[in-house]
Structure formats: structure tokens, C-alpha cells
Amino acid sequence: MPRGFLVKRNKKATPVSYRVRSEEDEQGAFVAQDVPCARRPVSPVQFGNPETVYRAMYSPTRPVSREHERACLERRFNLGSPISAESFPAAPNCSDQAPVDLKIGTSNSNRTGTTVTTKRPASDTERKGKPASKKAKAMRKLQFEDEMTTSPVLGLKIKEGPVEQKPRSQCASGDKPLGEFVCQLCREAYADPFSLAQHKCSRIVRIEYRCPECDKLFSCPANLASHRRWHKPKQSAESNKTPAPEKEETSSDRDTPSPGLSESGSEDGLYDCQHCGKKFKRQAYLKKHVTAHHDAPEKPQSHAPLNLSASECHLCPVCGENFPSRMSQERHIRLQHSAQVYPCKYCPAMFYSSPGLTRHINKCHPSENRQVILLQMPVRPAC
């Protein structure tokens, strides 16, 4: 067996001539001594085939035939080690490729290590984050339950419970312990649910809102605020100094005047009593005060309504003159203010504006009943 046969199979992928083998053996030995990475086991290609020695007699730089080229390419592709892939490996090339293999190995190992280490802390943080969120939800629920201590609609409030509570272990009779029906506020136990529902808890306090003007009690502040609007005078009544008494009467029916106001009055009132000088916020309060404390009720000077048939006063709506009876008032209007009066042709009503007379005729005397009323009405003598 020739000297360079083993070196050719172990170190070189392609066969070379015998003239170069002596130099390459020295270089291969130098590389094997200096570089430890070249000691990797290389999978030999075509092991034990002596025909490769005879084909290597040709020059490695220039193959003689295409079959030799094809064999060289197949050997290069079938090699497993990157070091043996070249036909003429040198010492610097081998030293460059060895650390590359080491770097690849270390980089792969580092990558796998980093991936494992990065996944583990992420899972730890996720596991730690879940109980924290549950604690936050529990704290929210506790705070919400603590805030539910008042009921503004029902007017109830729950007092703070005592620090030390002594639960009852047995009932009064001592037969069996009471723990099934217990009040959650005062911790008092009862034998049946009916007695638990009927008991009055000591921690529940009823809140009452009192009106400062009429002393009425309300359980809700919103109801008190809506009630106090009735005590305030309307701005429209202040702007219009001649309010209609019919509207005032309807509004006074809805109002509930307080006894304190009717007796003592208020300083901010708009209506003055002519007898005692007291002021009242509403005309209904003044009327009640006059009827209760003074014999001859008198109303403050105000314009009378246009329709005299529905009114109770006897003032002339044009000049304001007072008359003892209604007949004298109508006679005065016919004689003195005949040009400003619009009498109704179908009834004795009189109006002081054309739109008022028209509205009265359309409402009280429709077109179907006008002729019947005309036949029944007596002829009015001219004055």
C-alpha cells in the first residue's frame, strides 16, 4: 500500500498526483498538530475502492474527460464535512473554517438557551399578574359595598356598626342555636324569617327633609326641591303686573299655602294687606289672611276681568269706579263707555275688545243655535 493512500482518503475529497502527496502530508500533519478542530471524524466517500488511486494520476487542475468532472462534482455534493469539500485544503483555510464551526455550534446553543430563558420569565410574570388582577377586583367590590350605606330615595341611612360584636350562641329558650335567620347589620338572630323581616334594625336611621317655609317632611331631597318651587314667585307674574284672577284661582287650588305664611307673612312678598300692612308672596295667601283676620275682605287694586257676568267684583273695567251692585255697574258702562263696549247679540254678556267678543260667540253660540237663541231673546229697549 503506498504511503499517501490513507492521507488521501482521510484529508482530501479528490484524488491528486503522487508528486504533491509528500508536501501535502507535511501540511496535513502541521494542521493536525496546530488546529484541534481538524480532528473531526469525516465520513469517507467510497471507502476501500482502489480505483480512486488510479484515476488520481491525472492533473487535479484540469480533468481529462467529463466523466472525471462528473465524479468530482458528485463527491463534492456527497461530502458531509465542509472541510473535505475542497479539493486542495490549506492550513489557513482549515484554521478559518474550524472556528466557524465552533461559532455556529455556540450560536445555536446560545439561541436555544435564550429562547428557553425568555419563555420562563414571561410565564412567571403571567402567573404573578393573575392573582394581582383578582385582588384588584376584590378591592373594587369591597369599596363599592362600603359606599352603599345610604338610600336617597327612601331616605334611609345605615350607621357604622360597633367594632366588637358578640354573636348569640343560643336563643332565649336555650333549645337550639339561632343562626339561620340573622340580620346582616345588627347581627341579631331570629327563629323564623317573618320575625326577621318585621324587626326594626337599630343601625337603619330614617332621614327627613323639612321644608323651611311650611314644615312639611320629605324623605327625598328631590321631592323637597320640587315642593319648594311652589313657594317661589313666578317671574312671569312679576313682569306682567296685571295677572288674570282666573288663572290665579286655578293655581291657588293646586297650591297648599302654609299656615305660617298666612299668619305672619314674609318680607319679600308682592301683595300687601291694606288693614295690617303684612306682605305675602301670593294673592291666595293674602286672601286667606284677610278672610281669617279681617271682617270686610278687600282685594288690592287690580284690573277687573273683561267679562262682568263671571266676576264677583263691581269695579268699572274702563275707569275703575266702584259700584255697590251689578246693575248700577252695567248702567254706568252703557251710558259712559258705550263706544268702548262690545255687547253680545245673543246673551247679555259685554266685552271690551272685538277679539274677546268674537271668541265668546264662537265658543258659546255656534252657528246652529244662533237662530233659536235669537227667537227666545226679548227685544232690548234703546236707552
Curated annotation (Swiss-Prot):
Major subcellular site: nucleus
Gene Ontology molecular-function annotations: chromatin DNA binding; DNA-binding transcription factor activity; DNA-binding transcription factor activity, RNA polymerase II-specific; DNA-binding transcription repressor activity, RNA polymerase II-specific; RNA polymerase II cis-regulatory region sequence-specific DNA binding; sequence-specific DNA binding; zinc ion binding
Gene3D superfamilies in UniProt: Classic Zinc Finger
UniProt keyword list: Developmental protein, Differentiation, DNA-binding, Metal-binding, Neurogenesis, Nucleus, Repeat, Transcription, Transcription regulation, Zinc, Zinc-finger
SMART domains linked to this entry: ZnF_C2H2
Record GO biological process: cell dedifferentiation; negative regulation of DNA-templated transcription; negative regulation of transcription by RNA polymerase II; neuron differentiation; pancreatic A cell differentiation; posterior lateral line neuromast hair cell development; posterior lateral line neuromast primordium migration; regulation of cell cycle process
Basic residues: bias regions: 130-140
Compositionally biased tracts (Basic and acidic residues): 244-256
Zinc finger (C2H2-type): 209-231, 271-295, 314-337, 342-365
Subcellular location: Nucleus
Residue ranges, annotated region (Disordered): 99-141, 229-269
Annotated segments matching region SNAG domain: 1-20
GO cellular component: nucleus; transcription repressor complex
InterPro entries: INSM1/2, Znf_C2H2_sf, Znf_C2H2_type
Task of the protein: May act as a transcriptional regulator. May play a role in neurogenesis and neuroendocrine cell differentiation during embryonic development.
Family of this protein: Belongs to the INSM1 family.
Protein name: Insulinoma-associated protein 1a
Originating organism: Danio rerio
Taxonomic classification: Eukaryota, Metazoa, Chordata, Craniata, Vertebrata
Encoding gene (name): insm1a
